[in-house]
Amino acid sequence: MIFDTPLQGGQLIRRYKRFLADITLDSGERITAHCPNTGSMMGCAEPGSRVWVSRSDNPRRKYAYTWELVEVAAGVVVGVHTGRANALVEEALLAGRLPALRGYRRVRREVRVVNRPMRADLLLGDHSEGEPDCLLEVKNVTAAVADGVALFPDAVSARGTRHLDVLAAEARAGRRTALVFCVQRPDVREVHPADAIDRAYGQALRAALADGMEAYALQGGPSPEGIELTRELPVHCP
Protein backbone atom coordinates (compact mmCIF):
# COMPACT_ATOMS: atom_id res chain seq x y z
CA MET A 1 0.00 0.00 0.00
CA ILE A 2 1.46 3.30 -1.11
CA PHE A 3 0.03 6.42 0.49
CA ASP A 4 -1.97 8.55 -1.95
CA THR A 5 -0.11 11.69 -0.93
CA PRO A 6 3.18 12.10 0.95
CA LEU A 7 2.80 12.03 4.72
CA GLN A 8 3.79 15.07 6.75
CA GLY A 9 6.01 14.67 9.79
CA GLY A 10 5.65 16.29 13.15
CA GLN A 11 5.76 15.88 16.92
CA LEU A 12 2.91 14.61 19.07
CA ILE A 13 1.72 17.05 21.71
CA ARG A 14 -1.07 14.90 23.14
CA ARG A 15 -3.78 12.40 22.31
CA TYR A 16 -7.14 13.04 23.96
CA LYS A 17 -10.84 12.19 23.79
CA ARG A 18 -9.68 8.96 22.14
CA PHE A 19 -10.11 10.24 18.58
CA LEU A 20 -8.10 13.49 18.64
CA ALA A 21 -4.41 14.34 18.66
CA ASP A 22 -2.65 17.70 18.80
CA ILE A 23 0.51 17.73 16.70
CA THR A 24 3.15 20.27 15.75
CA LEU A 25 4.09 19.75 12.10
CA ASP A 26 7.67 20.12 10.90
CA SER A 27 6.57 23.40 9.33
CA GLY A 28 5.79 24.74 12.81
CA GLU A 29 2.02 24.67 12.29
CA ARG A 30 0.01 23.24 15.18
CA ILE A 31 -2.89 21.02 14.09
CA THR A 32 -5.56 18.79 15.54
CA ALA A 33 -5.66 15.44 13.73
CA HIS A 34 -8.15 12.61 13.75
CA CYS A 35 -6.82 9.59 15.65
CA PRO A 36 -8.21 6.48 13.90
CA ASN A 37 -7.54 4.08 16.76
CA THR A 38 -10.04 3.09 19.47
CA GLY A 39 -7.54 1.27 21.68
CA SER A 40 -5.35 2.56 24.48
CA MET A 41 -2.43 2.90 22.02
CA MET A 42 -0.16 1.47 24.71
CA GLY A 43 3.37 2.74 24.10
CA CYS A 44 2.32 4.53 20.90
CA ALA A 45 1.00 7.87 22.15
CA GLU A 46 3.82 9.35 24.20
CA PRO A 47 3.99 13.16 24.03
CA GLY A 48 7.03 14.27 22.07
CA SER A 49 7.01 11.23 19.77
CA ARG A 50 7.83 11.60 16.10
CA VAL A 51 4.60 11.13 14.11
CA TRP A 52 3.34 11.32 10.53
CA VAL A 53 -0.07 12.41 9.28
CA SER A 54 -1.98 12.29 6.01
CA ARG A 55 -4.05 15.20 4.74
CA SER A 56 -7.45 15.06 3.03
CA ASP A 57 -8.84 17.75 0.74
CA ASN A 58 -12.42 16.67 1.46
CA PRO A 59 -14.20 19.89 2.54
CA ARG A 60 -16.77 17.89 4.52
CA ARG A 61 -14.22 16.58 6.98
CA LYS A 62 -14.02 18.33 10.33
CA TYR A 63 -10.34 17.44 10.67
CA ALA A 64 -8.26 17.47 7.50
CA TYR A 65 -5.37 15.51 9.02
CA THR A 66 -5.27 11.85 10.07
CA TRP A 67 -2.61 10.36 12.32
CA GLU A 68 -0.96 7.47 10.46
CA LEU A 69 2.42 6.54 11.99
CA VAL A 70 4.47 6.97 15.16
CA GLU A 71 8.12 6.28 15.90
CA VAL A 72 8.19 4.39 19.23
CA ALA A 73 11.98 3.87 19.31
CA ALA A 74 14.89 4.77 17.08
CA GLY A 75 13.99 3.44 13.65
CA VAL A 76 10.88 1.59 14.87
CA VAL A 77 7.83 3.03 13.11
CA VAL A 78 4.34 1.74 13.98
CA GLY A 79 1.16 2.10 11.92
CA VAL A 80 -1.65 3.27 14.19
CA HIS A 81 -4.42 3.69 11.59
CA THR A 82 -6.64 0.69 12.32
CA GLY A 83 -8.81 1.49 9.31
CA ARG A 84 -6.01 0.42 6.96
CA ALA A 85 -5.70 -3.11 8.36
CA ASN A 86 -8.38 -4.75 6.21
CA ALA A 87 -6.94 -3.40 2.97
CA LEU A 88 -3.41 -4.38 3.99
CA VAL A 89 -4.45 -7.94 4.77
CA GLU A 90 -6.50 -8.22 1.57
CA GLU A 91 -3.51 -7.02 -0.45
CA ALA A 92 -1.22 -9.56 1.23
CA LEU A 93 -3.66 -12.45 0.77
CA LEU A 94 -4.14 -11.74 -2.93
CA ALA A 95 -0.34 -11.64 -3.28
CA GLY A 96 -0.12 -15.10 -1.68
CA ARG A 97 1.85 -14.02 1.38
CA LEU A 98 -0.07 -16.24 3.80
CA PRO A 99 0.45 -19.85 2.66
CA ALA A 100 -2.50 -21.31 4.59
CA LEU A 101 -4.92 -19.01 2.77
CA ARG A 102 -3.44 -19.13 -0.72
CA GLY A 103 -5.62 -20.00 -3.67
CA TYR A 104 -8.61 -17.77 -3.01
CA ARG A 105 -9.39 -15.71 -6.09
CA ARG A 106 -12.30 -13.63 -4.81
CA VAL A 107 -12.51 -11.34 -1.79
CA ARG A 108 -15.70 -9.69 -0.54
CA ARG A 109 -15.65 -7.02 2.15
CA GLU A 110 -17.95 -6.43 5.13
CA VAL A 111 -20.07 -9.53 4.58
CA ARG A 112 -22.99 -10.10 6.93
CA VAL A 113 -22.86 -13.48 8.67
CA VAL A 114 -26.27 -15.12 8.27
CA ASN A 115 -28.26 -15.21 11.52
CA ARG A 116 -25.31 -13.85 13.49
CA PRO A 117 -24.72 -10.37 15.00
CA MET A 118 -21.59 -9.71 12.95
CA ARG A 119 -20.19 -8.62 9.63
CA ALA A 120 -17.05 -10.48 8.60
CA ASP A 121 -14.26 -8.15 7.54
CA LEU A 122 -13.51 -10.35 4.53
CA LEU A 123 -15.05 -13.39 2.87
CA LEU A 124 -12.59 -15.39 0.78
CA GLY A 125 -14.06 -17.47 -2.03
CA ASP A 126 -13.54 -19.17 -5.40
CA HIS A 127 -10.59 -21.26 -4.25
CA SER A 128 -8.47 -22.69 -7.05
CA GLU A 129 -8.60 -26.19 -5.53
CA GLY A 130 -12.15 -26.13 -4.27
CA GLU A 131 -11.47 -25.27 -0.63
CA PRO A 132 -14.49 -23.88 1.24
CA ASP A 133 -15.09 -20.15 1.53
CA CYS A 134 -13.46 -18.55 4.57
CA LEU A 135 -14.97 -15.96 6.92
CA LEU A 136 -12.15 -13.74 8.07
CA GLU A 137 -11.76 -11.24 10.91
CA VAL A 138 -8.87 -8.72 10.87
CA LYS A 139 -7.35 -7.10 13.95
CA ASN A 140 -4.72 -4.36 13.93
CA VAL A 141 -1.84 -4.88 16.37
CA THR A 142 0.31 -2.02 17.67
CA ALA A 143 1.13 -2.95 21.29
CA ALA A 144 4.30 -4.80 22.25
CA VAL A 145 6.29 -5.75 25.32
CA ALA A 146 9.81 -7.02 25.89
CA ASP A 147 11.31 -9.97 24.02
CA GLY A 148 9.59 -9.18 20.73
CA VAL A 149 6.06 -10.08 21.84
CA ALA A 150 3.15 -8.23 20.26
CA LEU A 151 -0.11 -8.10 22.21
CA PHE A 152 -3.78 -7.87 21.32
CA PRO A 153 -5.96 -6.22 22.45
CA ASP A 154 -4.43 -3.13 24.07
CA ALA A 155 -7.75 -2.33 25.80
CA VAL A 156 -10.80 -4.34 26.80
CA SER A 157 -12.65 -5.33 23.62
CA ALA A 158 -16.11 -6.74 24.29
CA ARG A 159 -16.90 -6.41 20.58
CA GLY A 160 -13.80 -8.38 19.66
CA THR A 161 -14.79 -11.12 22.09
CA ARG A 162 -18.29 -11.31 20.60
CA HIS A 163 -16.82 -11.65 17.12
CA LEU A 164 -14.63 -14.53 18.27
CA ASP A 165 -17.71 -16.25 19.68
CA VAL A 166 -19.41 -15.92 16.28
CA LEU A 167 -16.39 -17.29 14.41
CA ALA A 168 -16.23 -20.19 16.87
CA ALA A 169 -19.92 -20.96 16.35
CA GLU A 170 -19.48 -20.86 12.58
CA ALA A 171 -16.48 -23.19 12.84
CA ARG A 172 -18.51 -25.64 14.92
CA ALA A 173 -21.17 -25.53 12.21
CA GLY A 174 -18.60 -26.61 9.63
CA ARG A 175 -17.58 -23.30 8.04
CA ARG A 176 -13.99 -22.24 7.59
CA THR A 177 -13.19 -19.22 9.76
CA ALA A 178 -9.97 -17.39 10.47
CA LEU A 179 -8.55 -14.47 12.42
CA VAL A 180 -5.64 -12.51 10.95
CA PHE A 181 -3.64 -10.11 13.11
CA CYS A 182 -2.26 -7.19 11.08
CA VAL A 183 1.00 -6.34 12.86
CA GLN A 184 2.05 -2.85 11.80
CA ARG A 185 5.42 -2.79 13.54
CA PRO A 186 8.73 -4.41 12.56
CA ASP A 187 10.26 -5.13 15.98
CA VAL A 188 8.23 -8.17 17.12
CA ARG A 189 8.47 -11.89 16.40
CA GLU A 190 5.17 -13.37 17.63
CA VAL A 191 1.66 -12.40 18.75
CA HIS A 192 0.09 -13.26 22.11
CA PRO A 193 -3.37 -12.56 23.54
CA ALA A 194 -3.09 -9.76 26.12
CA ASP A 195 -4.56 -11.71 29.03
CA ALA A 196 -3.49 -9.12 31.58
CA ILE A 197 -5.51 -6.48 29.70
CA ASP A 198 -8.55 -8.46 28.54
CA ARG A 199 -8.73 -11.97 29.97
CA ALA A 200 -12.13 -12.61 28.39
CA TYR A 201 -10.70 -12.00 24.92
CA GLY A 202 -7.86 -14.43 25.54
CA GLN A 203 -10.29 -17.08 26.76
CA ALA A 204 -12.54 -16.55 23.74
CA LEU A 205 -9.56 -16.82 21.39
CA ARG A 206 -8.44 -20.13 22.90
CA ALA A 207 -11.99 -21.48 22.80
CA ALA A 208 -12.41 -20.46 19.16
CA LEU A 209 -9.15 -22.15 18.20
CA ALA A 210 -10.30 -25.31 19.97
CA ASP A 211 -13.52 -25.17 17.94
CA GLY A 212 -11.61 -25.04 14.66
CA MET A 213 -11.08 -21.34 13.92
CA GLU A 214 -7.65 -20.60 12.45
CA ALA A 215 -5.41 -17.75 13.59
CA TYR A 216 -2.54 -16.11 11.71
CA ALA A 217 -0.45 -12.95 11.88
CA LEU A 218 1.07 -10.87 9.08
CA GLN A 219 3.76 -8.29 9.80
CA GLY A 220 4.85 -5.17 7.98
CA GLY A 221 7.32 -2.37 8.48
CA PRO A 222 5.48 0.93 7.93
CA SER A 223 7.25 3.95 6.49
CA PRO A 224 6.14 7.46 5.45
CA GLU A 225 5.95 6.13 1.88
CA GLY A 226 3.68 3.16 2.52
CA ILE A 227 2.97 -0.11 4.32
CA GLU A 228 3.28 -3.69 3.10
CA LEU A 229 2.69 -6.93 5.02
CA THR A 230 5.46 -9.29 3.96
CA ARG A 231 6.12 -11.73 6.80
CA GLU A 232 4.04 -14.30 8.68
CA LEU A 233 4.43 -14.42 12.46
CA PRO A 234 3.34 -17.19 14.84
CA VAL A 235 0.30 -16.68 17.05
CA HIS A 236 1.13 -18.10 20.48
CA CYS A 237 -1.67 -18.96 22.92
CA PRO A 238 -0.09 -20.76 25.90
Curated annotation (Swiss-Prot):
Pfam families: SfsA, SfsA_N
Domain of life: Bacteria
Xref: InterPro entries: SfsA, SfsA_C, SfsA_N
Gene Ontology MF annotations: DNA binding
Family as reported in the entry's similarity comment: Belongs to the SfsA family.
HAMAP family in UniProt: SfsA (MF_00095)
UniProt protein name: Sugar fermentation stimulation protein homolog
Upper lineage: Bacteria, Pseudomonadati, Pseudomonadota, Gammaproteobacteria, Chromatiales
Gene that produces this protein: sfsA
